[in-house]
Every structure is written in structure tokens, then in C-alpha cells.
């Protein structure tokens, strides 16, 4: 539940509400994504984690923008949250372990997994979005008569 509830709740709020509002306000997908990512990171209230969380917010924002669905950012957010929770459980039983308690070499192996999964989804949906845009440009225009 630690990984599920924030993934669904935060994505509904940040991508499903804020990003849509900013898109209507700015009429720019990129600006809406960046503003939402900055707010997403600021709300987490971690000074040293601001840039990494902003980058996560950008990834989640582009996943939503290019896929047209909340599910890809929810899944990516879930994986990002679940990996450290599972890791902590495996390392220390039922207690939550801080990243500083986990050997650096182990962090370097496991923690990039959610990032790689997100990048793969991001590239897939970007390619699909470009393909869909190109195919709609190549369709003949009918007069509707």
C-alpha cells in the first residue's frame, strides 16, 4: 500500500488535475509539464532531493502527455516507490531502512531499475505519439457530405 496509494493519488492530482489545468492555461504541453514537475518536487519538501524529484515529475508528465493515459505514469510511479520498499523489507525485515543504511554498490545496482523502466515506457509512448500524429496527417480530408 505504501507504493500503490501515492502512485495513484499523486498522479491523479499532479497529472490528472494540475497538468491539465496548466495545459489549458499556458496552451503548451512542455510548459505545463515543467511547471507541474516543479510543483510536484516542491510538495515533497526535500531540499537535496528537489532536482531528482523534478526529473521524476518530468518523466511522469511526459508519460501522461505522450500516452494520453494516467496509467503509464501511475505504473512508473508505483515501480519507483515499490523498489525501495521491497529492498528495505528484504534487507531488514519489517523495518524501513534509509538509503544511507544500504551499501552504495547495492543502491547502484537496484535503484536504476525504476528509472530504466520509466525511460523504456517514455520512449515507447513518445514514438507511438509521433507515429499517431504522422498517421493522422496522412489521412485524406473528407468534406462530410
Locate each region found by the language model.
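Transmembrane alpha-helical segments in integral membrane proteins
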Residues: 1-22, 117-128
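Active-site His/Glu-centered metal-binding helix of metallohydrolases
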Residues: 8-13, 17-18, 42, 46, ...
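Hydrophobic alpha-helical transmembrane segments
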Residues: 30-35, 50-51, 74-75, 112
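Small-polar-interrupted transmembrane alpha-helices in polytopic inner-membrane proteins
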Residues: 2, 29-44
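Membrane-interface helix/loop boundary segments of multi-pass membrane proteins
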Residues: 9-35, 62-69
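Hydrophobic residues within alpha-helical transmembrane segments
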Residues: 35-39, 55, 75, 79
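C-terminal membrane module of polytopic membrane proteins
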Residues: 78-145
Amino acid at each position: 500500500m505504501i507504493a500503490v496509494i501515492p502512485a495513484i493519488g499523486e498522479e491523479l492530482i499532479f497529472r490528472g488535475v494540475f497538468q491539465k489545468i496548466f495545459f489549458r492555461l499556458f496552451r503548451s504541453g512542455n510548459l505545463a509539464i515543467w511547471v507541474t514537475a516543479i510543483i510536484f518536487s516542491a510538495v515533497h519538501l526535500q531540499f537535496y532531493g528537489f532536482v531528482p524529484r523534478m526529473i521524476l515529475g518530468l518523466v511522469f508528465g511526459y508519460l501522461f502527455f505522450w500516452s494520453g493515459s494516467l496509467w503509464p505514469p501511475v505504473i512508473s510511479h508505483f515501480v519507483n516507490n515499490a523498489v525501495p520498499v521491497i529492498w528495505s523489507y528484504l534487507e531488514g525485515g519489517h523495518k524501513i531502512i534509509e538509503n544511507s543504511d544500504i551499501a552504495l554498490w547495492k543502491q547502484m545496482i537496484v535503484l536504476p531499475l525504476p528509472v530504466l523502466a520509466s525511460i523504456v515506457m517514455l520512449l515507447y509512448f513518445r514514438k507511438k505519439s509521433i507515429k499517431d500524429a504522422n498517421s493522422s496527417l496522412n489521412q485524406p480530408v473528407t468534406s462530410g457530405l
